[in-house]
Amino acid sequence: MFDDESNILYIDDFLLVVNKPSGLLTIPDGYNPEIETARSLLEPEYGHLWIVHRLDKGTSGILVLARDKDTHRALNQQFASHEVRKEYHLVALGIPDQNQWDVALPLLVNGNRSHHTTIDLQAGKTAFTHFSVIDRFTSGYSCISAQPYTGYTHQIRAHLTASGLSIAGDPLYKPKPHPSIEQQVKITPPKNLITANRLMLHAW
C-alpha cells in the first residue's frame, strides 16, 4: 500500500506526508484496536509517528504525520489556530445551481460504529463548511471543493447532505435538504446513478 513511492509525497527529519488510500483508518477507532491503520503500516519503515490530523476511513488523500514531539506540538497549534487551510474534492450526485455556498449548521457526532453525524440545532456543536463547484457534468454529477473550518467526524458529508447532495460511493449519507440551505441552493438530480466502489472524497 505504502510500498509504492508515489504515495510518499514528502519526507524530511520532521515530517512525513502521504497519500492515504480510501478504506484505511488513520489510527484505531476504539472498536478494533488491532486493525491495520495508516500509522501501523508506516511506522515499521519510518519509526514512531505522531498523528497531526485524521482522515475518515473512506476518505483518501493527503495525511500529515510528525516524526518528533516538537513538530507534532507545532503542527497541532497551526491546525488549532486555523493557519492550515483544509480542502477536499468530491464527486457529488446532482448539480447545484449555485457556484458556491456556506453551511453553518451545528453537528452532533453519534458514538456508534458508523459514526453517523447529524444536524442538531439544540445539542450540536458549531460547524462551518464552504462549498464551491469545480465542474459540472452532463451526466448530472458535479465536482465540488469543500473547505471545512471545523473538523468534526463526517462534517463534509453531513453538511453536503443538508445541501441536498451526497457523495458518489457513500453508503451512509443520502440527500436530506435542510430548509435553511434549500432556500439558497437548488439541486438538479443526476440522470443516471453510477456505482462507485469507494467514497469519492479526497483530501487535496
Where would I find each of the regions flagged by the language model?
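RNA pseudouridine synthases
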Residues: M1-W204
